Amino acid sequence: MNTTTTSSSTDVRDTILATGQRIMGAKGFSAVGLNEVLTAAGVPKGSFYHYFASKEAFGEALLADYFTTYLADMDRLFRQPGQAKAQQLDAYFSAWQESQSFEDCQGKCLAVKLGAEVADLSASMRAALKHGTAGIIDRLARALQAGAEDGSLSFTGTPEALAQSLYQLWLGASIMVKIVRNAQPFDTALHTTRQLLHPSR
């Protein structure tokens, strides 16, 4: 195998995905043509189908790549030494507020932007969204459980149910931020989150 060729091919694919994430994170999936992505990526138009079978397959890969990176970032945050889980969870939601800007999220709000749009358009993209969001909720649930065990958190109900409620709260806040064009929904979500978690002082 020619490792140089393989590496170059992977680099081109990654460039297309990163460019698509940035553009579609701002404009949505349906509104963006492949030519716009490829031109911005500096990739010849005829080479797209060497990497992706269709625009739908590209969208599925886009979401899979997005969630892989997102979940890895969550894992790094929740493995930070010397921090109680309450601190780590607070840092996670504070980072959410900072990254999901209504002005320009630079592709970091892809799940929010594409969630409602593609769920009814593509079964494979909906499955990628379902799998990715399940991974987020699972990590939140494990962090909540660990917080209860280390004594930094106190909450009612199961960690799984609370994790799902918190994710839905913040997903809704992300949509409202885009509607009202200010950060107030995030401020409310963070206040509600802290009330639900009863962090130890």
Model-derived features: positions:
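Short alpha-helical elements of helix-turn-helix
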Residues: 14, 18, 109-112
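Helix-turn-helix
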Residues: 15, 19-57, 61
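Amphipathic, non-transmembrane alpha-helical scaffold segments
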Residues: 9, 17, 63, 67, ...
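Amphipathic alpha-helical segments used for helix-helix packing
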Residues: 88, 102-124
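C-terminal peripheral helix-coil segments that are non-catalytic and often amphipathic
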Residues: 1-3, 87, 91-99, 134-150, ...
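Hydrophobic alpha-helical connector segments
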Residues: 61, 65, 75-107, 159-166
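N-terminal intrinsically disordered/low-complexity leader segments
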Residues: 1-11
